[in-house]
From Swiss-Prot:
The name this protein goes by in its record: Amphipathic peptide VmCT1
Outcome after substituting F24G: Decrease in antibacterial activity against the antibiotic-resistant bacterium S.aureus, and no change in absence of antibacterial activity against both antibiotic-resistant bacteria E.cloacae and P.aeruginosa, as well as in decrease in hemolytic activity
Tissue: Expressed by the venom gland.
Phenylalanine amide PTM positions: F36
Record key words, sorted: Amidation, Antibiotic, Antimicrobial, Cleavage on pair of basic residues, Cytolysis, Hemolysis, Membrane, Secreted, Signal, Target cell membrane, Target membrane
Site, as annotated: Important for activity: W29
GO biological process, one term: defense response to bacterium
Family indicated by similarity: Belongs to the non-disulfide-bridged peptide (NDBP) superfamily. Short antimicrobial peptide (group 4) family.
Segments forming a coiled coil: none
Signal sequence bounds: 1-23
Effect recorded for F24K: Decrease in antibacterial activity, increase in antifungal activity and decrease in hemolytic activity. Important decrease or loss in antibacterial, antifungal and hemolytic activities
């Protein structure tokens, strides 16, 4: 009876460790997807046009009005 109880406790502890690590890895995966996904990288590309040297002040003002 003692052996069965110890095996049960060890199994419960191991299952909790697995479930917590799965949640942690899932959270890391979601962060990686949001940073490197299409929508995450799109936000980094929005300001590339404002640093182009060939743009005039009117172009910059128009872009700023569009992004508001």
């Amino acid at each position: 009876m003692k052996t069965q109880f110890v095996i049960l406790i060890v199994a419960v502890v191991l299952l909790q460790l697995i479930s917590h690590s799965e949640a942690f890895l899932g959270a890391l995966w979601n962060v990686a997807k949001s940073v490197f996904g299409k929508r995450g990288l799109r936000n980094f590309d929005d300001l590339d046009d404002t640093f182009e040297p060939e743009m005039s002040e009117a172009d910059l003002k128009y872009l700023q009005d569009l992004l508001r």
